[in-house]
């Protein structure tokens, strides 16, 4: 369960067939189908690690040339009111109703001792969002200068048109689709496994990311414990809602902009590969998408 929290945090973020082609690049060129000039697709990772900024030759040239910068959420138009309202569980649920007394004590002690926070402050918050605090702390990930933020700031400096391929409510609703009971289990697992699995998973994920090995990233995303029905259910929800549905939305919404002018699209790397990944969805629309 915890590894899915890691993926949500980093790719924020498929059980589809991978097929014969190897997705071995983070950087893809989109052309053909009447486009006047090429656009570009880049798989990001929400990380400050220096390695994610070691771009392949041509990435920054493509970024600098692009007239439009497209990301998952346009930071200029994030709806804070919608965000805050969606963080709250309905009136019949709270952490105390979802956790056993022992589980509540474990989580409460962890928040007090490791995070310096009182758990009652998060009593009505959806557990998955609370889990993000644990996962981010475990990975020592501070969100200020992560790769996606870096691209956004550079786009603003260059006065590019910046657009979001998703709406705040859509991303929040994806989280809300996970039953509270599964969210609560994920929170307890994250606390119990703090400092044990996260570092190993992150090292492996970073290795595949730096290699541009999207196939392996996709494989990590689809893994689940077959003996844990909750983990299997979480994996299916992650696949259907966090990836497939969002992939279709982003591919459709990107199309008017790549027709308008050269667009640099930067989205989580997990959204690129697979039969229903953005690469294949754009190809099905008639575009030529090749690794650069």
Regions found by a protein language model. Give the residues of each.
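Bacterial Sec-dependent N-terminal signal peptides
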Residues: 1-28
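Short, glycine/serine-rich, charged loops/turns that create anion-binding
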Residues: 12, 46, 270-271
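A conditional alpha-helix N-cap/helix-loop micro-motif detector
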Residues: 20, 52, 144, 243-247
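Residues that act as N-cap/strand-start positions at coil-to-secondary-structure junctions
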Residues: 22-24, 149, 248
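Structured, acidic catalytic/metal-binding patches in enzyme active sites
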Residues: 29-233, 238
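A cross-kingdom marker for long, charged
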Residues: 232, 236-292
């Amino acid at each position: 369960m915890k590894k899915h929290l890691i993926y949500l945090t980093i790719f924020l973020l498929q059980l589809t067939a991978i097929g014969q082609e190897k997705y071995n690049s983070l950087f893809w060129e989109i052309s053909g189908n009447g486009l006047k000039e090429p656009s570009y697709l880049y798989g990001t990772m929400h990380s400050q690690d220096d390695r994610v900024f070691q771009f392949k030759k041509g990435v920054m040239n493509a970024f600098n040339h692009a007239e439009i910068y497209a990301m998952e959420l346009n930071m200029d138009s994030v709806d804070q009111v919608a965000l805050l309202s969606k963080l709250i569980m309905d009136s019949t649920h709270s952490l105390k109703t979802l956790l056993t007394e022992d589980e509540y004590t474990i989580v409460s002690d962890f928040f007090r001792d490791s995070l310096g926070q009182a758990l009652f402050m998060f009593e009505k918050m959806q557990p998955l969002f609370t889990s993000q605090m644990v996962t981010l702390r475990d990975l020592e990930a501070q969100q200020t200068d992560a790769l996606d933020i870096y691209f956004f700031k550079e786009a603003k400096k260059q006065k590019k048109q910046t657009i979001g391929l998703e709406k705040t409510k859509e991303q929040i609703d994806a989280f809300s689709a996970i039953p509270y009971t599964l969210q609560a289990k994920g929170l307890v697992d994250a606390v119990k496994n703090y400092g044990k699995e996260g570092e190993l998973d992150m090292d492996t994920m970073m290795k595949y990311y730096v290699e541009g090995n999207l196939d392996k990233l996709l494989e990590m995303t689809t893994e689940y414990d077959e003996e844990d029905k909750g983990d299997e259910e979480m994996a299916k929800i992650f696949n259907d809602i966090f990836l497939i549905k969002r992939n279709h939305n982003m591919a459709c919404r990107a199309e008017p902009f790549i027709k308008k002018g050269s667009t640099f699209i930067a989205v989580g790397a997990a959204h690129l590969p697979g039969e229903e990944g953005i690469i294949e969805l754009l190809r099905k629309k008639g575009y030529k998408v090749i690794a650069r």
